[in-house]
Amino acid sequence: FIALVYPLVEAGVLGNDALLSCYSLTGYSGGGKKMIAEYKSEDKSPLLFAPRQYGLTQQHKHLKEMKGITGIENAPIFCPVVDDFYSGMQVTVPLFAEQISCSSSEIADIYRAKYQGPVVTFCDKSDNGGFLCAGALSGTDGMKISVYGNDERILLTAVYDNLGKGASGAALENLNLVMGKDKAFGLDI
């Protein structure tokens, strides 16, 4: 969400008063040891074989940072979904064209300028035959940002590993910066 929204607020094409929504599809490993055990259990509940939406009270722990870091005034409606795959994540922020003061191709240009890799890259299309796969970057530390949709309805997407860099990868990235190395040195991108 932050990687998708912040550059647009920063560029002044998305107002900080925007009313946004976001949904994510994530592998179960992000739920921690208890959830991993539930999904790997031989007595796995039949309910775990289908996607499950959570955060239904709109009190998700990441809402504060989603709002604070992007500079938007209103927390988004956030609809996270966990599914029966180990790792990977897809985040989508849908926009009506009226919500933004530029075209989808101009949004792509903003992302293209900001996300030139190696960790976060803009991809004109990261779908697979019209399907966006949440597990496409499982086991890596990278993120792919894309823009889909049409002239009326725009989809901003990010695909990455929900485990991804994590705290240890972030620590390695910070150490690389302190040591004067490329920030991606030692990360699996």
List the predicted regions and their residue ranges.
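A glycine-rich, Thr/Ser-enriched phosphate-binding loop motif common to dinucleotide/cofactor-binding enzymes
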Residues: 1-3, 54-61, 163-172
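Alpha-helical support elements that line or immediately flank enzyme active sites
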Residues: 1-14, 22
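Alpha-helical scaffold segments in soluble metabolic enzymes
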Residues: 3-7, 65-69, 170, 177
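Short acidic/polar capping segments at secondary-structure boundaries
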Residues: 6-7, 26-29, 161
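Short, hydrophobic alpha-helical segments
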Residues: 12, 70, 97, 174-182
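C-terminal substrate-binding/catalytic lobe of Rossmann-fold NAD(P)-dependent oxidoreductases
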Residues: 16-19, 23-156
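NAD(P)-dependent Rossmann-like dehydrogenase/reductase catalytic/cofactor-binding core
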Residues: 142-189
